[in-house]
């Protein structure tokens, strides 16, 4: 099973390491044409506005929309969550607009307010280690979106069919459970 990690920004190598730890084949994605060979795609963190601009410049917007429209699994972490959302609070235009949710950028504060915690995640039998760095949150979800995890009453992980979103960075820990969950989603989508 080939899982790509969009290599425009973010902890690409760390995602690849965890994909491979749970039995997937990790692929560094630098060109839109590479999507054709993939079973799933991770859009990692970074800065969502910059990621959006780079996606437009390098032809990823329509390519990723087409990939998702084929029913292939997409996982957005931190800024990647913002990129796949269909609404961003305080912003007129979404980037990919794939997942029926409204998100708020930098909801957990600045860099110095970053933290780690263990979260219960629906569908995973033990708490998941989560790193929050200038993390967004999910303000609202539409019908058909399943809330997977909350932190202090705020939504931090959700799923809509073949789409998965997490406010946190699962790749910055040694906990591979979110990546295992994503690989299970890819198997379901086949």
Swiss-Prot record:
It comes from the Bacteria. L-glutamine binds at residues 46-48, 105, 133-134. Its EC number is 4.3.3.6, 3.5.1.2. Transmembrane segments: none annotated. GO terms for molecular function: glutaminase activity; pyridoxal 5'-phosphate synthase (glutamine hydrolysing) activity. PROSITE patterns: PDXT_SNO_1, PDXT_SNO_2. The active site is at residues 78, 169, 171. InterPro entries: Class_I_gatase-like, PdxT/SNO, PdxT/SNO_CS. Gene3D superfamilies: 3.40.50.880. Pathway: Cofactor biosynthesis; pyridoxal 5'-phosphate biosynthesis. Keywords: Glutamine amidotransferase, Hydrolase, Lyase, Pyridoxal phosphate. It catalyses: aldehydo-D-ribose 5-phosphate + D-glyceraldehyde 3-phosphate + L-glutamine = pyridoxal 5'-phosphate + L-glutamate + phosphate + 3 H2O + H(+); L-glutamine + H2O = L-glutamate + NH4(+). GO terms for biological process: glutamine catabolic process; pyridoxal phosphate biosynthetic process; pyridoxine metabolic process. Disulfide bonds: none annotated. One of its GO terms (cellular component) is cytosol. Belongs to the glutaminase PdxT/SNO family. PANTHER family: PYRIDOXAL 5'-PHOSPHATE SYNTHASE SUBUNIT SNO, PYRIDOXAL 5'-PHOSPHATE SYNTHASE SUBUNIT SNO1-RELATED. In the presence of PdxS, forms a dodecamer of heterodimers. Only shows activity in the heterodimer. Catalyzes the hydrolysis of glutamine to glutamate and ammonia as part of the biosynthesis of pyridoxal 5'-phosphate. The resulting ammonia molecule is channeled to the active site of PdxS. This is Pyridoxal 5'-phosphate synthase subunit PdxT. It comes from Niallia circulans (Bacillus circulans). The lineage of its organism: Bacteria, Bacillati, Bacillota, Bacilli, Bacillales. The gene is pdxT.
């Amino acid at each position: 099973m080939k899982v790509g990690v969009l290599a425009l920004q973010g902890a690409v190598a760390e995602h690849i390491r965890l994909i491979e730890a749970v039995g997937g084949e990790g692929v560094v994605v630098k060109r839109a044409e590479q999507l054709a060979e993939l079973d799933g795609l991770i859009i990692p963190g970074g800065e969502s506005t910059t990621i959006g601009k780079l996606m437009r410049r390098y032809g990823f917007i329509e390519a990723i929309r087409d990939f998702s429209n084929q029913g292939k699994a997409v996982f957005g972490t931190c800024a990647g969550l913002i990129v796949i959302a269909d609404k961003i609070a305080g912003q007129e235009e979404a980037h990919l607009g794939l997942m029926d949710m409204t998100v708020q950028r930098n909801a957990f504060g600045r860099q110095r307010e970053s933290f780690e915690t263990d979260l219960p995640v629906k569908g995973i039998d033990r708490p998941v280690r989560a790193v929050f760095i200038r993390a967004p949150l999910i303000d609202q979800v539409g019908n058909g979106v399943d809330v997977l995890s909350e932190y202090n009453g705020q939504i931090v992980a959700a799923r809509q069919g073949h789409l998965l979103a997490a406010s946190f960075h699962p790749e910055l820990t040694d906990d591979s459970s979110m990546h295992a969950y994503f690989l299970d989603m890819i198997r379901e989508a086949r």
